Curated annotation (Swiss-Prot):
Its main location: mitochondrion. Keywords: Mitochondrion, Mitochondrion nucleoid, Transcription, Transcription regulation, Transit peptide. The keyword Zinc does not apply. It comes from the Eukaryota. This is Transcription elongation factor, mitochondrial. GO terms for molecular function: DNA polymerase processivity factor activity; nucleic acid binding; transcription elongation factor activity. Transcription elongation factor which increases mitochondrial RNA polymerase processivity. Regulates transcription of the mitochondrial genome, including genes important for the oxidative phosphorylation machinery. One of its GO terms (cellular component) is mitochondrial matrix. Pfam families: HHH_3 (PF12836). It comes from Bos taurus (Bovine). The lineage of its organism: Eukaryota, Metazoa, Chordata, Craniata, Vertebrata. It is found in: Mitochondrion matrix; Mitochondrion matrix, Mitochondrion nucleoid. GO terms for biological process: mitochondrial transcription; positive regulation of mitochondrial transcription; transcription elongation by mitochondrial RNA polymerase. InterPro entries: RNaseH_sf, RuvA_2-like, TEFM.
Length: 356
């Protein structure tokens, strides 16, 4: 039996009859379906998956990976259990199950091309799977990625994880409509300073920038030096027009704190002032009821008591200051000075969530 076959001769296509079983026909057929590709020298390929011609060009998987890499990939595919395969992110769910089922029915994979016979495995995903097997995410790498994601949700602006981990002390600052409070803690969770001050005149009059500058500068002069200054990121919604004066006050205060405390930013571009998610602190201390954060007064009261009663309290108040701090707390019990409580809780949460 013969079939027509096309050959390019003298720049024109011509038809020649060839036997179906002819080795020449097979060679020509393979030549038409596959172009030459040069295999990289023992490197993991970085394929542009947006290029739809990758498969059409005939680049077989076996030519994209060295023999050693192929052996490593096949060893995992042929020996790993369903649970072990799910350790690779791209193989979770149905894909790992399908690999195991395919092995049971057809035996071990003989080459990488055979992986595409498994349901859900197309050309692009197969290359990604092979790369992930060669470069699995280690436990340490996963932990770093998780910590980086947490930091992005917890604090703004984004800063290097290494800078956060190396912090020695912070000043946690919480401002309200009438007062501002701060807590200075080191990485041993020792409370080095904790106080509040009032600034009643700021929300009176025309919200003059010069008045804010004078008032906030005076307050900052009382604050201790630290590696980071952590502000509470919160404020009323834009959707309520009646709260616009309060919102304006919060933003002006925040802007002043960012400008006056970021003393080296112009030189090195490094942020020293950060804003921390208020609700994240509330969740950490179980103060949230739905979307509403409740008072942290009782938590602070318990921390003060534990510092005296326990050998290893959660927070350490220096003996020479504990009496003053307890008196300060007692004097605010009737007024519920939330800024004072929140500044301490925010500092503790920063260390426990971002540093430790």
């Amino acid at each position: 039996m013969t079939v027509p076959s096309l050959l390019l001769a003298g720049g024109r296509w011509r038809c020649f009859p060839l036997p179906l079983a002819s080795s020449l026909f097979q060679a020509l057929h393979n030549s038409c379906c596959r172009k030459e590709s040069t295999a990289p020298k023992k490197i993991i390929p970085h394929i542009d998956f947006s290029d739809e011609t990758a498969k059409e060009s005939g680049k077989t998987l076996d030519k994209l990976f060295s023999s050693e890499q192929q052996a490593s990939i096949l060893h995992v595919l042929n020996t790993a259990s369903n649970k072990e395969l799910e350790a690779f992110k791209l193989l979770r769910g149905k894909k790992s199950f399908n690999i195991v089922e395919h092995r049971k029915k057809f035996g071990p994979f003989q080459n990488l091309e055979s992986l595409m016979n498994v349901p859900l495995f197309q050309y692009k995903i197969t290359i990604q799977v092979c790369n992930s097997i060669l470069n699995p995410e280690t436990g340490g790498k996963k932990k770093k990625l998780q910590e980086s994601r947490l930091l992005r949700k917890l604090i703004k602006p984004e800063i290097g994880r290494e800078r956060v981990k190396a912090v020695n002390s912070i000043v946690s600052i919480v401002s309200g409509t009438r007062r501002i409070a701060w807590a200075h803690l080191d990485r041993k969770l020792a409370v080095l300073d904790w106080q509040q001050t009032e600034y009643c005149q700021l929300m009176k009059g025309s919200y003059l920038s010069s008045v804010y500058l004078e008032e906030i500068s005076s307050i900052i002069s009382k604050m201790p030096k630290a590696d980071f200054y952590v502000l509470e990121k919160a404020g009323p919604s834009f959707q309520n027009p009646s709260l616009f004066p309060v919102l304006l006050h919060f933003h002006m205060t925040e802007a002043m704190l960012y400008a006056l405390l970021n003393t080296t930013f112009a030189q090195d571009g490094h942020h020293q002032v950060l804003s921390m998610n208020r609700n994240a602190v509330g969740k950490h201390f179980e103060l949230m009821i739905g979307d509403t954060r409740t008072s942290g007064k009782e938590v602070v009261k318990q921390l003060l008591s534990e510092s005296v009663l326990k050998d290893e309290p959660r927070v350490f108040f220096p003996p020479e200051k504990i009496v003053r701090y307890r008196q300060m707390f007692s004097s605010t019990e009737h007024n519920r000075v939330e800024e004072l409580y929140d500044s301490l809780l925010q500092a503790i949460a920063f260390y426990e969530l971002a540093v430790f």
